[in-house]
UniProtKB/Swiss-Prot annotation:
This is Probable sodium/glutamine symporter GlnT. One of its GO terms (cellular component) is plasma membrane. It comes from Bacillus subtilis (strain 168). InterPro entries: Na/Ala_symport. It is found in: Cell membrane. The gene is glnT. PROSITE patterns: NA_ALANINE_SYMP. The chain crosses the membrane at residues 14-34, 85-105, 145-165, 185-205, 211-231, 236-256, 298-318, 342-362, 381-401, 411-431. Keywords: Amino-acid transport, Cell membrane, Ion transport, Membrane, Sodium, Sodium transport, Symport, Transmembrane, Transmembrane helix, Transport. Probably functions as a sodium/glutamine symporter for glutamine uptake.
Length: 478
């Protein structure tokens, strides 16, 4: 039965990832990049400023922009940054890293669009703000069926399949480092995680905020130590990445097509640009203008890939471990780091993976809960979902690595297709919001959003109409 499932999933992934999704992600990302006038470069300083502003704003009764950023980063900065990169290099060669950089740079524009839309079309309930692709598909496009389809896909993807990926990597890391029984670890994971997911969204936000920053800094610190210790190899490694990306150097076994496909796959799994996941976290923030959260989430994509994923890539490529046949995933990263700093690194990385993976479990779970709320407000359904999440965490701990990752790729691809269509159709709303933000910044103001700046503001619930009714036509930005 498992072999049949592996075969079906493999065929579906080949159809999705060989051409279709690569073309869609690159073409939409390039389109948004040009329409936003290379926002990811020209507004990089503003991204940092807005993030710092969000970190300074605190409220007991709402989720701050920085907390929303941390929820999304908790999902992004998971095992994909460590295990996914190793798989990309093993299957696609060093050139896969180059294509990950490209997809992150142009994908950050897609992330800006989807997260800004999530803020514009967010809704409010007793627990605070909620939103995401399902909500802007219903309220912006007036297509509830499309929102429902996406809600089902993201709930299955993140809450169910992606959480099994995280637990799978954690269990393998502990098995490699300490010989820990994988089922036992799975039971421990669900015991701890179960106490958290019954605690509500705000508890999730606070936990994510407290863990994710420390983990990222710790891992980057170790990576920088490795980089500076091997600084003389850096030019050669960079040259290897570029040559392999275009098929000029096949020594590592990665042809152009393999490098491109693996780079895009693992890049999207790690930074989630255009996938429609981060907008669910972006919508929860209390902010004065939707563009602010769009900028913060775009910065998250760049940070995740260009800093954290690249750190893993250098750890691997500075060693000879990636030449070892059959070595992939977390085992490759553990072997590579151990070659740099000693055998203790395997255990250190296992513990780090546990914490990284746990953060990702938190973010992934929240995405599913938000979209179940879109489908049905039933508390019983949420309870069933929580039990399903816990069951899949145990399944991931004992399942085969390849099947788990292949399932993740399949559901991720379906999500991307639905979301990209929606954000393309709604992109003019974002372009208008950005013009409004830029206009207010040039006037020396802290931008504040009013929904009547848009010609059509049907479906927008949480943003007020401007106080000044005079000359409304002139305030609208075409």
């Amino acid at each position: 039965m498992q072999q049949i499932l592996e075969h079906i999933v493999g065929i579906a992934n080949d159809l999705l990832w060989s051409k279709l999704l690569i073309v869609l992600l690159l073409s939409f990302g390039i389109y948004f990049t040009f329409r936003l006038k290379f926002l990811q470069v020209r507004m990089l300083k503003e991204m940092v400023r807005v993030l710092r502003e969000g970190a300074a704003s605190r409220s007991k009764n709402s989720i701050s922009p920085f907390q929303a950023f941390c929820i999304s980063m908790a999902a992004r900065v998971g095992t994909g940054n460590i295990t996914g990169i190793a798989i990309a290099i093993a299957l696609g060669g060093p050139g896969a890293i180059f294509w990950m950089w490209i997809i992150a740079i142009i994908g950050s524009a897609s992330s800006f669009v989807e997260s800004t839309l999530a803020q514009i079309y967010k809704v409010k309930d007793v627990n605070g703000f909620r939103g995401g692709p399902a909500y802007y598909m219903e309220k912006g496009l007036n297509k509830r069926w499309m929102g429902a389809l996406f809600a089902v896909l993201i709930t299955l993807s993140f809450g169910i399949v992606f959480n099994s990926v995280q637990s799978n990597t954690v269990s393998l890391a502990f098995e490699n480092a300490f010989g820990t029984n994988r089922l036992t670890l799975g039971l421990i994971l669900i015991a701890v995680f179960g106490t958290i997911i019954f605690g509500g969204v705000k508890r999730i936000a606070k936990l994510a905020e407290s863990i994710v920053v420390v983990l990222a800094v710790l891992y980057i610190g170790v990576a920088f130590f490795v980089i500076f210790s091997n600084i003389t190899q850096l030019p050669g490694v960079l040259a290897l990445i570029v040559k392999n990306a275009f098929g000029f150097d096949q020594a590592a076994g990665g042809a152009l097509g393999a490098a491109l496909m693996q780079g895009v796959r693992r890049g999207i799994f790690s930074n989630e640009a255009g996938m429609g996941s981060a907008p669910n976290a972006a919508a929860t923030a209390t902010t004065s203008h939707p563009v602010k959260q769009g900028l913060i989430q775009a910065f998250g994509v760049l940070t995740d890939t260009l800093v954290i994923c690249t750190s893993t890539a250098f750890i691997i490529l500075f060693s000879d471990a990636y030449h070892t046949p059959g070595l992939s995933g977390i085992a490759l990263t553990q072997a590579s780091l151990s070659s740099h700093v000693g055998s203790w690194a395997s255990g250190f990385l296992a513990i780090l993976i546990l914490l990284f993976g746990f953060c990702a479990l938190i973010g992934n779970y929240y995405y599913g809960e938000t979209n179940i709320g879109f489908l049905n407000k039933s508390k019983k359904l949420i309870f069933v979902y929580r039990i399903g999440v816990l069951a899949m965490i145990v399944f991931g701990c004992v399942a085969k690595v390849q099947l788990v990752w292949d399932l993740a790729d399949l559901f991720m691809g379906l999500m991307v297709i639905v979301n990209l269509i929606a954000i393309f159709l709604l992109s003019k709303v974002v372009f208008t919001a950005l013009k409004d933000y830029t206009r207010q910044k040039k006037a020396g103001k802290d931008p504040v959003f009013y929904k009547d700046v848009l010609k059509n503001h049907n479906g927008i619930e949480c943003w007020p109409v401007s106080d000044t009714k005079t000359d409304t036509h002139n305030k609208q930005i075409s």
